[in-house]
């Protein structure tokens, strides 16, 4: 189901509630094959979790290490190993989610975008070792770097100040998405180097 933010500390003026929100609509539905529930609001039968061997501990948060994907990895295994099971979104199961102060810092947001791209590549896509895929990934990374630099420059000089009243909004919503591409490419290249 959905989750909505709450705060124990003063949030920065630029930080919008929607940055800490997940909502897939007001109608209950079975998720499409390429959609996944967020781990922030995920329920699973214990017996099914045990049958699948639990969560993949190679991905996700570990101690102080930032990571994502353990819930996505689990949902992918449910679909592969138990195809008759349904993954269901129920909007009435709402969670209030504490947004910790560090998650409202711009540097943390940048790192989170990179890591989410890296881990999405790790969990959802086959991290291929074929040379052509590595080359294409590197080309996407170069483009993402150029977009990142362009976004920083344009953000300061020419951003839509109505839509992005603070430079942080522009960076978070427009520029930092390119960090996901860089994270994905990083995972592909490092995976290739290891194999």
Task: Give each language-model segment a name.
Residues 1-2, 16-35:
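Short, flexible, basic/aromatic active-site loop/helix in glycosyltransferases
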Residues 1-13:
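Conserved donor NDP-sugar-binding/catalytic core segment of glycosyltransferases
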Residues 37-38, 113:
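An anion-binding catalytic pocket shared by soluble metabolic enzymes
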Residues 59-67, 96-118, 122:
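Nucleotide-sugar-dependent glycosyltransferase catalytic core
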Residues 108-118, 127-195:
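Non-catalytic, C-terminal membrane-associated alpha-helical segments of glycosyltransferases
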């Amino acid at each position: 189901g959905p989750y909505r933010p709450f705060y124990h500390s003063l949030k920065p003026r630029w930080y919008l509630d929607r940055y800490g929100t997940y909502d897939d609509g007001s109608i209950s539905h079975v998720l499409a094959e390429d959609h996944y529930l967020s781990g922030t609001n995920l329920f699973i039968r214990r017996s099914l979790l045990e049958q699948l061997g639990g969560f993949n501990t190679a991905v996700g948060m570990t101690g102080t290490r930032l990571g994502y994907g353990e819930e996505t990895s689990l949902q992918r295994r449910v679909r592969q190993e138990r195809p008759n099971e349904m993954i269901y979104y129920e909007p009435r199961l709402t969670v209030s989610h504490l947004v910790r102060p560090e998650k409202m810092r711009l540097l943390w947001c940048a790192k989170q975008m990179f890591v989410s791209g890296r881990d999405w590549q790790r969990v959802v896509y086959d991290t291929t070792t074929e040379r052509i895929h590595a080359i294409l990934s590197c080309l996407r990374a170069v483009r993402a770097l150029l977009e990142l630099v362009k976004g920083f420059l344009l953000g300061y000089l020419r951003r839509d100040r109505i839509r992005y009243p603070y430079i942080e909004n522009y960076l978070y919503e427009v520029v930092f998405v390119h960090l996901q591409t860089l994270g994905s490419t990083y995972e592909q290249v490092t995976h290739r180097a290891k194999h």
